[in-house]
Structures are given as structure tokens and as C-alpha cells.
Amino acid sequence: MISRSLFNAGLFLTVIGLTPLSQAQTPSPAQSKSPRPSYSLAPYEDRLAAAQSVKVTISILGLELGSTLEQAHAKLDKLSDPAHPPKEEEEGQERKVLWQLARTDYSAVFVKSDERKRITYINAFLRPGKEIPFEKIGDTKKAPLQDVNTIVWDVLRPNRPLFRVMAKGADRKANNMTIFVVKRPGLERAAD
């Protein structure tokens, strides 16, 4: 009964032309394809080589994975909005800190750290109008996952755990960047 009412309402709106679906044109296959690198489903060896050699932004405002919370405070406290001091929270051995920033292209930075107070996760939000094109963040040909709104790079460097750089935003311009250690139980190496 309810589905019939919804169907009738949808049909009515379509007939009188009030729904965006009734006015939108069906995109051609060329328009709807998301740009995908040719190796996205490539053999493991090719993806590994890409992760080892990719050129991609691995720091935000000078912070990298493995930095200490003390280093993060030294860099971000002075950039913080005085009306919004950093917010800290502990959850087990993990620590979380949020900075609302005043004098950068970023409006906020959120980090998580491990039991050694080393950063394992960074999430940064860009201000409106300060979005960064995916191509300026990294080599899009070496990103195994991407579409028009999201791109993800795997990064593997000597003596470092596998980590991931992810950018999100409309029209291949990031308004949000996340860098994090990929946790693989039983396979993790300590980052010193």
C-alpha cells in the first residue's frame, strides 16, 4: 500500500516535471567512467612497486606519521584559533587531539597517537576555496583507488609500516586529507 502511494507520487512528480531525475539527461558512458589507473587491478608486484615509488604528500603542516604528540603541539598550538584551544581525549592507550586552526589553509587537524604517543592518523580539513587538486597531492596514475570525489594511495617506505593517503572532495579537488597507518595484525613493524 505504501509502496503504491510512493510510486504514484513519484509518477505524478515526474509527469509534471518537478523531479531532477525527470529533467536530467542520462550521462554517456564516457562521462560516467571514473578515471582509473591501468594497474588498479594489476598483479600484487605492480601494486607493491607503485606503493614503494609513488610521489605523494605525506605530511600536513609539517606533521608526518611517526611524529610525536609533543611535536604536533609545538607546530599546531601556535596556529590554533585562540577561541578554540586544542581538545584532547584518551581512549585506552590511544590519544586523540583536535586543533581548530586560525592562520592556515586548513580549518582543523585531528590526530590519533599510539601508546608511545607517536602519530598514527592525521585528518585535515581545508577551508572553502583552498581545495587542492588530486594531481597536486600525488601521482594519480599510481593511486589504486579513485573516482571523481575520492583518491587513495598506498605508500610503502623502508623501515616504515604500510600507510595510506586519502583525499576527498568534489570534482577531483580535496577538501579533506587523511594519512594513516594501515594496521595489519601480526604483520606490523614498529615505526621509529
Residue spans of the language-model regions?
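Short hydrophobic/aromatic-rich motifs at helix boundaries and adjacent loops
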Residues: 6, 40-45, 107-110
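Short, compositionally biased low-complexity segments enriched in polar/charged residues
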Residues: 97-113
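Bacterial N-terminal signal peptides that target proteins for export
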Residues: 1-10
